[in-house]
Amino acid sequence: METNNDKIIAFKYEYRNYQKRALKEIDKYVDDNKIHIVAAPGAGKTILALKLVFDFNVNTLILVPTIAIREQWVERMLNDFTNIDKKQISTSLKELKKFNIISYQALYEYDKEEIKKIIKKNNIHTIVLDEAHHLRNAWWKLLSQVFEELKNIKIISLTATPPYDDEKNFEKYIGLCGEIDAQINIPELVGEKNLCPHQDFIYLNVPTKEQEKQINEYRVNSIKIIKWLNNNQSIIKAIATHKFIIDYKNNIDDIITNYNIFIIMLKFLNDRNIFVNQYIKDVNKSYSPMKICDYENFFKYLLYTNDKEFEIIESTLKELKSMLLQVGAIDNGNIDLLYNKEIEKELSQNIGKLNSINTIIEHEYNNLKEKLKLVVVTDFIKDDYSDFDDSEINQLGVMPIFRNITQNLKSLKICVLTGSTIIIPTDTVQIFMDICKNNNIKDENIVVNEIGNDFKYSRIQLRNNSLIVKIITELFKKSDISVLIGTVALIGEGWDAPFVNTLIMASSISSYVTSNQIRGRAIRIDKNNISKEANIWHLVCLEKCGNRYVKGKDYEKIEKRFNAIEGLALTENKLVSNINRFDYFDRSLVYEDISRINNIMLEESSKRELISKRWFIALEKYIPNNKLLIKKENILKNKKLIYKKCQPFVSYRSNRYSCIRTFTNSFLDSTFIHFECRSHSKNNYKY
């Protein structure tokens, strides 16, 4: 406990069970001076960090991403802990005290040497990094340099969303924040009633005929390139005579560093019945023939890795690159033989998703009636669809979705909230004006223009735009508006609307950080509705393969979105992570299957009360999942496997390779652990 003039600073309330568990876990890892806490929104990360800060009893610098969050820290200190002297709290770098809460932006105005001087001069010994997932670019670089040169400083890192799915940045992130010491997961918060029970649903769509044609043409061109490679004698010879193949004993370091490429070479030669030494042939026994992802990885290695072994076929590689560029298979150094950017965009913006949104909204309204508070989140505004005319809607975006709903579900009231466009039902304008008045916005600063043929909706403009999100959110809550449509950019981190009970993610976002932030908007506890259960909908466009539909690029994004999210299985009383909570996507489907699955999703979404009960049944058997421990175990296990597979020409216990630091986590994570195809859908294409 920290004492303030002989008075004990203590938390005023009782810690929740998951907070007690986290504090016990943290106690084991304080010695390395890096404490890393990962906790879902609502877990009380701030309280945990303040407990540590007061226990350490030293001058502290707390870094936060926004002014609003800065004020929340001050509020937590003063309201939730006893015996805090307000005079010891500062929010200015120019006047540091014992407890200092500063924005990252304010710190970034100084260079590395100036920051070091500030820290030393003010005897700072603890630094807290709030919302640490923000620290992957310029801020990360600056702080990494500062911390590298300053010793004996404790770093406490807090986040709800580590960049698990971004291998390159995750390594940097862990380098700065340290390995994860304590993790509080969403199910624990539901169990303590800090988050509401919820369920994810997937609604399926199929490509248009034009999209099918576009994909097939692209695949035909990719097959031609693969066949060209398979029959190119200069490339075959270069691989067969590569040092990895003919002189493996003297190239163990390079083989382990490029282990996936080594395996691809073996598979390539094996597919051509080309003999290789029996020792290294044994390494390849368990691997299947070349797949699309193998060709993609190998093409990237050939074109963008400075491997002197392939300099002899430089002209051939130029020809390969030219062919790939011609079909649009290269994007920023990455190679995709199944899709290009244009096709990927077409699928994620599939026009069928507009009708899916209507179906979901109509279904949810029929179940909840006036209690429905549904948010549709999408990527783009598409202002060119703002006119209320009869023009065809063939894109996905805020305005196309708004127009499509108002045309087909006319009884529902909708509002639009983006940085540039605010639209509300005309009959809610008076409520809107009253809310503005309560926020000290004068009438002369508000412009209201009725729009549409029947003037049922009005476009709003405010001179003080900083309050618009707060005001529209309050309007959404207080009025009979059932649906709000907005962009990811605006309805993301920090948007607080606990009354929202349904979310449609009509976005192509796949990253764990962003998608988890958006999901978090819907699963917050509503104090005015203690029985709240939230439904979260994800839209997927499948891909046609012959007469059946299979997972494709759009599905890959949703699969990635689910990878680090624990939730309730669709029909079983158990909590699982990743997309395996659904039982329907482990095989190809016919069109009738798609309709059947969509109907099952709609039917299950109607059982909100049952979903809540099932959550608490599942929680009785729940064991918190610590992703860090899993990652550590995988790394060690796969290190040993690599050595084992490379025997007899290297021993895992040899002095040369005994130091675990010889191999970086990023190498192991990006090669061996994830060596298989990046999606199960790729297994449908073998050449």
Predicted regions, residues:
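Conserved pre-motif I regulatory segment
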Residues: 2-38
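Walker A/P-loop
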Residues: 31-52
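Conserved C-terminal RecA-like helicase domain
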Residues: 40-43, 47, 82-88, 93-100, ...
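Conserved helix-turn-beta segment of the N-terminal RecA-like "Helicase ATP-binding" lobe
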Residues: 60, 67-93, 174-177
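Conserved RecA-like ASCE ATPase "motif II neighborhood" in helicase/translocase motors
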Residues: 100-128, 135-145
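Post-DEXD/H (motif II) to motif III coupling segment of the RecA-like Helicase ATP-binding lobe
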Residues: 137-195
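Long, largely alpha-helical accessory region at the distal end of helicase-like NTP-driven motors
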Residues: 229-275, 552-687
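Conserved RecA-like P-loop NTPase helicase motor core
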Residues: 388-391, 404-578
